[in-house]
């Protein structure tokens, strides 16, 4: 799975701490759960910017601070940068 490959990349090639790797994985899982609730599925290759915006709004509605939301977005930016480098996606849904 793409998420597992990304987390292994962080763990073994980037030497991120296990705590950081787990946090990145949790951030991706949160988006996955949101996507499944909203559109019935999660395929990181097909995520659209609109879904990301809706997810951000839902996080803010749940009381997440802007700092926490930005950290989650940073995790997702890293994930999509990884996918772009591997040729898995051609468009980054987080790119402005």
Question: Model-derived features: where do they sit?
Answer:
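N-terminal core-binding DNA-recognition domain of tyrosine recombinases/integrases
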Residues: 4-19, 25-96
């Amino acid at each position: 799975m793409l998420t597992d490959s990304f987390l292994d990349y962080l763990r073994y090639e980037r030497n991120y701490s296990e705590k950081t790797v787990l946090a990145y994985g949790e951030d991706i899982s949160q988006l996955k759960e949101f996507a499944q609730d909203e559109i019935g599925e999660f395929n990181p290759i097909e995520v659209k910017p609109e879904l990301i915006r809706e997810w951000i709004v839902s996080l803010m509605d749940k009381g997440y601070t802007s700092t926490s939301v930005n950290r989650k977005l940073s995790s997702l930016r890293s994930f999509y940068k990884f996918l772009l480098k591997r040729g898995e996606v051609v468009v980054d849904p987080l790119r402005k």
